[in-house]
């Protein structure tokens, strides 16, 4: 689960709208996937794209990325815009937000099922079917194990949360007591 910065979401929306207009969403998504791998490599080396851009000739770095990963012209110009506006540090969040835009466009929602133990594929499939009917769209669920919820489940998707956990019930009970006494 990611809490995204509003700046990253805004940049992702702009990139997505341009990719839709040019009918190159899948190519841009592929470019961003390659850039994500490059950023992971840099992170392992304790470096960031912003740091590399400041150390090297800025144009050479973007040209290197463009040729090494065969980036589309839109992706290349987008990277240059991020660099010009000192927003390269947002790239990983922009990639996540862009993926969310693509999923939304395709009618897919990403959700998280938080449980105290790992659920079976059959159980996840059952709850997925219920919420797909409710949402009227495809749902991709990741099962996250969190022992702190004590028991029950929490289902999160988009901006919604269904908290049916023991911890959630205890906290709701505490809130009611504080309000009434």
Curated annotation (Swiss-Prot):
Predominant location of this chain? membrane
Quote any Pfam family the record assigns: OSCP
Under the cellular component aspect of Gene Ontology, which terms does the record hold? Answer: plasma membrane; proton-transporting ATP synthase complex
* Keywords associated with the record: ATP synthesis, Cell inner membrane, Cell membrane, CF(1), Hydrogen ion transport, Ion transport, Membrane, Transport
In the UniProt record, does the keyword Magnesium occur?
A: no
InterPro entries in the record, alphabetically?
A: ATP_synth_OSCP/delta_N_sf, ATPase_OSCP/dsu
Query: What is the top-level taxon of the source organism?
Result: Bacteria
Q: Does the keyword Methyltransferase apply?
A: no
Q: How does it sit in the membrane?
A: Peripheral membrane protein
Question: Which GO molecular function, any one, fits this protein according to its record?
Answer: proton-transporting ATP synthase activity, rotational mechanism
Compartmental location: Cell inner membrane
UniProt similarity note: Belongs to the ATPase delta chain family.
Tell me the function of this protein. Answer: F(1)F(0) ATP synthase produces ATP from ADP in the presence of a proton or sodium gradient. F-type ATPases consist of two structural domains, F(1) containing the extramembraneous catalytic core and F(0) containing the membrane proton channel, linked together by a central stalk and a peripheral stalk. During catalysis, ATP synthesis in the catalytic domain of F(1) is coupled via a rotary mechanism of the central stalk subunits to proton translocation.
Describe, as the record does, how this protein assembles with itself and its partners: F-type ATPases have 2 components, F(1) - the catalytic core - and F(0) - the membrane proton channel. F(1) has five subunits: alpha(3), beta(3), gamma(1), delta(1), epsilon(1). F(0) has three main subunits: a(1), b(2) and c(10-14). The alpha and beta chains form an alternating ring which encloses part of the gamma chain. F(1) is attached to F(0) by a central stalk formed by the gamma and epsilon chains, while a peripheral stalk is formed by the delta and b chains.
Q: What is this protein called?
A: ATP synthase subunit delta
Gene symbol here is atpH
């Amino acid at each position: 689960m990611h809490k995204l910065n509003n700046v990253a979401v805004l940049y992702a929306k702009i990139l997505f709208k341009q990719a839709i207009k040019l009918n190159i969403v899948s190519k841009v998504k592929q470019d961003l996937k390659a850039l994500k791998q490059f950023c992971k490599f840099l992170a392992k080396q304790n470096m960031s794209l912003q740091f590399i851009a400041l150390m090297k000739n800025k144009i050479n770095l973007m040209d290197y990325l463009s040729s090494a990963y065969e980036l589309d012209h839109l992706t290349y110009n987008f990277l240059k815009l991020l660099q010009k506006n000192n927003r390269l540090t947002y790239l990983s969040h922009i990639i996540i937000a862009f993926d969310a835009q693509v999923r939304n466009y395709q009618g897919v929602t990403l959700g998280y099922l938080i449980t105290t133990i790992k659920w079976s594929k059959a159980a996840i499939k059952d709850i997925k079917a219920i919420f797909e009917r409710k949402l009227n769209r495809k749902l991709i669920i990741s099962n996250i194990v969190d022992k702190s919820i004590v028991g029950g489940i929490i289902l999160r998707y988009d901006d919604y949360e269904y908290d049916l956990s023991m911890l959630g019930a205890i906290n709701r009970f505490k809130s009611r007591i504080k309000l009434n006494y």
